[in-house]
Amino acid sequence: MSRNQLALFDAALMRVALLDALKKLDPRTQVRNPVMFVVWLGSVVTTLLAVAMAAGKTPGDTGFTVAISVWLWFTVLFANFAEALAEGRSKAQANSLKGVTKTSFAKKLNEAKYGTSHYPVAADTLRKGDWVLVEAGDIIPCDGEVLEGGASVDESAITGESAPVIRESGGDFSSVTGGTRILSDWLVVQCSVNPGETFLDRMIAMVEGATRRKTPNEIALTILLLALTIVLLLATVTLWPFSAWGGNPVSITVLVALLVCLIPTTIGGLLSAIGVAGMSRMLGANVIATSGRAVEAAGDVDVLLLDKTGTITLGNRQATQFLPAAGVSEEQLADAAQLASLADETPEGRSIVVLAKQKFNLRERDLNSMGATFIPFSAQTRMSGVNVQQRAIRKGAADAVRRYIDSNGGQFPGEVNSLVDRVARAGGTPLVVSDGNRVMGVVALKDIVKGGIKERFAELRKMGIKTVMITGDNPLTAAAIAAEAGVDDFLSEATPEAKLALIRQYQAEGRLVAMTGDGTNDAPALAQADVAVAMNSGTQAAKEAGNMVDLDSNPTKLLEVVHIGKQMLMTRGSLTTFSIANDVAKYFAILPAAFAATYPQLNQLNVMGLHSPASAILSAVIFNALVIVFLIPLALKGVSYRALSAAALLRRNLWIYGVGGLLVPFLGIKLIDMLLTVTGLA
C-alpha cells in the first residue's frame, strides 16, 4: 500500500515553508548553493545601491534599481520556498512515523527463556543484547530478534496496513520493530540496538536531517552549474570596460541583472527540491531509503534480480494432479500423499489434502488416532512425511527422494524421472512421493504467474533494463516459468553464494544491480547490490545490509522503486535542459537592452520588440523569478514517466524541455513587458 499523499500545496505546509524560506536567507545557508548564492550577493549589491541612490549618495534611476532589487530577492525566496516546501512534505511524512506509540517500560528478563523471572525497567534504558518479554497488549519496546515464541503483531502504525502479521522465532520473520503492538500470544525478544538507534529513530533522523548529503550526480551537476556561473560572471565583468570604452558605461544594476538572468538560476533554485522530493515520493510508496544516493542509483539500475515467489508468481503453489508410477493407482498415490500432508500446514500441503478429498473422497483421517509420527520438512533432507502403521511415507524434491530411496536399498524408476521432467517443463513443481523404498509417483504443484507481469517486464526491456528471475526450482521448472513470465534470464537452484556471484558478475560488466531480500542468508547479496530493498518483515541482518526498507514487505515494490528513481533523474535532467535553454531567450531580451546606448547596432537583436531597455531588463528579471514558482509543482511531482529507451526519452525531453525552454521565455518576457508598459510601470 501507499501512504496518504499530501496535497501538493497544503496550506499548513505552505505557511511553514514561507517562514523557512525567510530563514534560509542566512548567508551560511545560501552559500551551500553556489548559483543562488551569486543571486543573493547580487540582491545585496542592488539593495545597497538603491539605498545609496535614495539617499542621494549615488546617481542613477532609483525606481529601476529598487524594482530589480525586489525581484532578485524574490528569486532567492522562491528558490528557498521550493526547497522548504519539499523538506516540509518529507517532515510531514516523518511525523506519521513519529506518531508511533512508544512504551514507557519493558519487562526485562534475566534469562532468554519464557517463564523465567522478569522485572519492569524504563524502555529507554534497554541496551543491545538485553532480553525482554512482550505479551498480548504490550508495545514492543525495542528493535530486536525473536528468540522464542510466536505472536500476532499490529504494525499498522509503521506500514499503514491494518492486517496483523505473524512474528516468530527462527526463519525470515523473526525481526520486530519497536513501537509495534502485540495482539496475541507472547514473544521473547533480544534487543538489537541501543536507545536512539532504532529503525524508526534512524529513519526519522534521516528524513528530518538538517543537512541532506548530496548524491554523486547532484554534486557533478552542481559543479557544472558553478563552472557555468563562473564563466558567465567573468564574461559579465569584462563587459563593463567595453561599455566604458564606448563612452557610455553600463550601470552595476544592469550588469547584476544580466548576470542573474544568464546563469542557470532555474535548475540552481530547484535542484535541492528535486532531490528531497524524490526521497519523499519513495516514502509515499512506503519505502524508506537510507540516503538520496540509493534513490539515485535506482534510476540508473539496468539489472533487476527478482525472486520468483511473491514477485513473479503469486507464491501460493497448489496441487493440480496426481501422476502415479508404474504399478501404482492414482488413488494409492493420493492416499500416500494425503497422509504425508495431513500435518503439513504449508499452502502446498493443504492443497494436496484438498485435492485428494475432491478426487477420491479421502477424508476424516486423524493422524493421532492412527499413532502416526509427523516428520517435518528440513533444509538438510528437503523432505517431509509421516511414519504410520509400519509405513514410512515421504514427499519432497526428486533428487532428495532419490537419495532416500537409494539409502534404503530401493530403486528410483526411470518413468518417474520422465514424469518429473514433464511437470517441470510445464512450469510446475514436481513433488515425488514414496512409501518405504517404493516410489509411488509425482504430485504436480502449479504456481500462478501474476497477471500483467509479462507486460511490465516488456516495458522494462524497452528501457534497457534486464530482468533475472531468482528461484530455488530446478532448471526445467525455472525455464518454463521464465518463458511464461517473460523475464530475460533466470538463476535456478539459487543459493546465497550463487546470488552473490551473479551480482558481482554483472557489476564487473559495469552494470548496476537491484534486488530484494528478507532473510539473513540474503544479507551478503543485499550488501553487494547497488540498490538493495530489504523487507520490513525480514531479519535485522537483511535490513541492515540493504539501503532501502519496504514497509509493506512486498517484493514487487522493486519495480516501483526503479520507476521513482528514474523519474527523479529525468526530472533533474529535464529541468536542467529547460534552464539552460531559457538563457538563450533571455540573452536576446537583456543584452541588446543593456548595451543599446553604447552600441545601437545591437537593437537588431531585439527580436521581441520590447518597449524600452529598462522594461526589457526588468521583464527578464521578473520572468527569471516567476519561472521558478511555475516549475515547483513539476519539481515536486516529477516529470511524466514513460517506458521508453534512453535514446527515445532523450529525444522526447529535448523537444519538450529544450525547445520549450527556448520558446517559453520569449512569450513570457514579451507578455510581462506588455503588462509593464500598459500599467505604466516600465
From Swiss-Prot:
What is this entry's stated membrane topology?
Answer: Multi-pass membrane protein
Q: For this protein, what reaction is catalysed?
A: K(+)(out) + ATP + H2O = K(+)(in) + ADP + phosphate + H(+)
Binding, Mg(2+): 518, 522
Which keywords does this Swiss-Prot/TrEMBL entry list? ATP-binding, Cell inner membrane, Cell membrane, Ion transport, Magnesium, Membrane, Metal-binding, Nucleotide-binding, Phosphoprotein, Potassium, Potassium transport, Translocase, Transmembrane, Transmembrane helix, Transport
Major subcellular site: membrane
A single Pfam family it belongs to is E1-E2_ATPase
- Which InterPro entries does the UniProt record give? ATPase_P-typ_cyto_dom_N (IPR023299), ATPase_P-typ_P_site (IPR018303), ATPase_P-typ_TM_dom_sf (IPR023298), ATPase_P-typ_transduc_dom_A_sf (IPR008250), HAD-like_sf (IPR036412), HAD_sf (IPR023214), P-type_ATPase_bsu_IA (IPR006391), P_typ_ATPase (IPR001757)
Residue numbers annotated as active site: 307
Q: What does this protein do?
A: Part of the high-affinity ATP-driven potassium transport (or Kdp) system, which catalyzes the hydrolysis of ATP coupled with the electrogenic transport of potassium into the cytoplasm. This subunit is responsible for energy coupling to the transport system and for the release of the potassium ions to the cytoplasm.
Describe its assembly.
Answer: The system is composed of three essential subunits: KdpA, KdpB and KdpC.
Entry's family note: Belongs to the cation transport ATPase (P-type) (TC 3.A.3) family. Type IA subfamily.
Protein name, entry field: Potassium-transporting ATPase ATP-binding subunit
